[in-house]
Regions:
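Conserved helix-loop functional segments at active or binding sites
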Residues: 2-6, 31, 62, 66, ...
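P-loop NTPase nucleotide-binding/switch module
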Residues: 4-27
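A glycine-rich phosphate-binding loop feature that marks nucleotide/adenosyl-phosphate handling sites
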Residues: 11-16, 75-83, 158-164, 200-205
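Core structural elements
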Residues: 23-27, 34, 210
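Conserved phosphate/anionic-ligand binding catalytic regions in large, soluble enzymes, centered on
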Residues: 29-53
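Conserved glycine-bearing catalytic or ligand-binding loops at nucleotide- and phosphate-handling centers
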Residues: 44-104
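Gly/Lys-enriched N-terminal cap/neck module of very large, oligomeric protein machines
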Residues: 104-227
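Conserved small/polar residues in nucleotide/adenosyl-binding loops
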Residues: 229-236
Length: 239
């Protein structure tokens, strides 16, 4: 939003012509890469995953200092997407492919731990869940599997989440193998989830699939255009 009122970007009419809206925002950080984006239009779709703020800015700075950097170099700065709900990325091949081509797949697992007491009674504790997984529906799915006896050994499911974070407790029957139960939960519930990456964005009003370097290059070009326009406007006022 900074400098939006200083004629740094073009304004266009909204859908019914009643207001003027900015064609793009004069952002100072690579928001598209940081926040990600998801949407469907006629004949195309986009699913860009979120990335770490500091890593994204550092990557942009690295390109400014060394414009010939390759995607492989940028992956040392931004090794993977950064999900607000946490989770564990299972494998990196899909991430590398997406960084190079703009398309790929990432498999995300919940972060879990197993607690076993002296009576051989175990609990599976879930402390982070995959990106965009609804926690209430996840808990209900596990409970439904227990009711339908599709997974033997489930005793009780509780959502103990609070302001400090996610905590889902899955109590198991005595003598049950918790590793087997956990693998079944990964297979049958969104505790393991795959996300397709499709980095489609409008570049000069034309949809294009972008790799990691292209996303950052376009952001840098945008910032240069905004800064140049701002400078010219400032000089005009002084004249």
């Amino acid at each position: 939003m900074a400098d939006l009122n200083k004629d740094t970007v073009n304004f266009v009419e909204n859908y019914d012509g009643t207001e003027s809206i900015p064609e793009v925002m004069p952002t100072k950080i690579p928001n598209l890469l940081i926040n990600g984006s998801s949407g469907i239009a006629v004949g195309m779709a986009t699913n860009m995953l979120p990335h770490n703020l500091t890593e994204s800015i550092n990557a942009a700075i690295a390109i400014l200092e060394s414009p010939d950097l390759e995607v492989e170099d940028l992956l040392k700065i931004i090794p993977a997407p950064d999900f607000p709900t946490g989770g564990i990325i299972n494998g990196t091949q899909g991430i590398i492919e997406a960084a190079k081509t703009g398309r790929g797949k990432v498999i995300l697992r919940a972060k879990t731990e197993i607690e076993t007491d002296k009576k051989d009674k175990s609990k599976i504790i879930v402390t982070e869940i995959p990106y965009q997984v609804n926690k209430a529906r996840l808990v209900e799915k596990i409970a439904q599997l227990a009711r339908d006896k599709r997974i033997d050994g489930l005793l009780e499911i509780r959502d103990e989440s609070d302001k400090d974070g996610v905590r889902i407790v899955v109590e198991l029957k005595t003598g049950t193998n918790p590793e087997v139960i956990l693998n079944n939960l990964f297979a049958l519930t969104p505790l393991e989830n795959s996300d397709g990456i499709n980095n489609v964005a409008l570049v000069n009003n034309v949809p294009k699939v972008l790799n990691l370097k292209e996303i950052l290059d376009i952001f840098i070009s945008h910032r240069r255009a905004v800064s140049y326009t701002h400078l010219r406007a400032h000089e005009t006022v002084e004249d």
